[in-house]
Amino acid sequence: MDDKQYKGTTTVGIICNNGLVLATERRATMGNLIASRDAQKIYQLTDNIAMTIAGSVGDGQRLARMLQAESKLFELRRHGPMSINALSMLLSNLLWEYRIFYIQVLVGGVDKSGPKLFSLDPAGGRITEVKFSSTGSGSPLAYGVLEDRYKQDMSVEQGVELAAKALESAMKRDSASGNGMQFCVITPGKVEIFEREVGKQVCNS
């Protein structure tokens, strides 16, 4: 991968009993340089679906625009929204067909059957996650926290706190991760994206 590209790093996705939590840190690197301290790595795709990127920020931005456009066209043609499963399959096909996107993606949302989360590799490999997932250079550190502290039937409030702890663990040891956090909480009928400083608690869980 070209070191002159801006790269995003640690992302986390957690399935909760009443929704889905996606979280990322904000640093983007270009080789050994911290190129950005407020990189956008969460993108809302539809009224109930969002995705995170780890890897080339430019590739992630282009892919998000493609998915937003395709989901809008689908809705106009079919008179209804694209399902989470269908959008993740479209994403898988795009990644495989082009094979130029240097990114890992988490995509998920909430529909009639509940929260769903998928992880995809740069070649389009697609895995259905049943609890949580993490991508990027800090993911091994994030996974340690997720494996230890995840509980079945967590609320989204508890999911936000767990995601924050996982990101904080990655940011302490991974030089490509840092500079604050961004969260996306998806519940039935609502997508909320917000930021948070390291060390601050969003809610009491």
Swiss-Prot record:
Description of activity control: The formation of the proteasomal ATPase PAN-20S proteasome complex, via the docking of the C-termini of PAN into the intersubunit pockets in the alpha-rings, triggers opening of the gate for substrate entry. Interconversion between the open-gate and close-gate conformations leads to a dynamic regulation of the 20S proteasome proteolysis activity.
Localization (cell): Cytoplasm
Single annotated GO MF: threonine-type endopeptidase activity
EC number(s) stated in the UniProt entry for this protein: 3.4.25.1
Functional summary from the UniProt entry: Component of the proteasome core, a large protease complex with broad specificity involved in protein degradation.
Any one annotated GO CC term: cytoplasm
Subunit comment: The 20S proteasome core is composed of 14 alpha and 14 beta subunits that assemble into four stacked heptameric rings, resulting in a barrel-shaped structure. The two inner rings, each composed of seven catalytic beta subunits, are sandwiched by two outer rings, each composed of seven alpha subunits. The catalytic chamber with the active sites is on the inside of the barrel. Has a gated structure, the ends of the cylinder being occluded by the N-termini of the alpha-subunits. Is capped at one or both ends by the proteasome regulatory ATPase, PAN.
Residues annotated as the enzyme's active site: T9
Gene that encodes the chain: psmB
Propeptide: 1-8
Record organism: Methanocella paludicola (strain DSM 17711 / JCM 13418 / NBRC 101707 / SANAE)
NCBIfam families tied to this protein: arc_protsome_B
Biological-process GO terms, alphabetical: proteasomal protein catabolic process
UniProt family annotation: Belongs to the peptidase T1B family.
Predominant subcellular localization, coarse grouping: cytoplasm
One Pfam family, short name: Proteasome
Protein known as: Proteasome subunit beta
Assigned keywords, A-Z: Autocatalytic cleavage, Cytoplasm, Hydrolase, Protease, Proteasome, Threonine protease, Zymogen
Catalytic activity: Cleavage of peptide bonds with very broad specificity
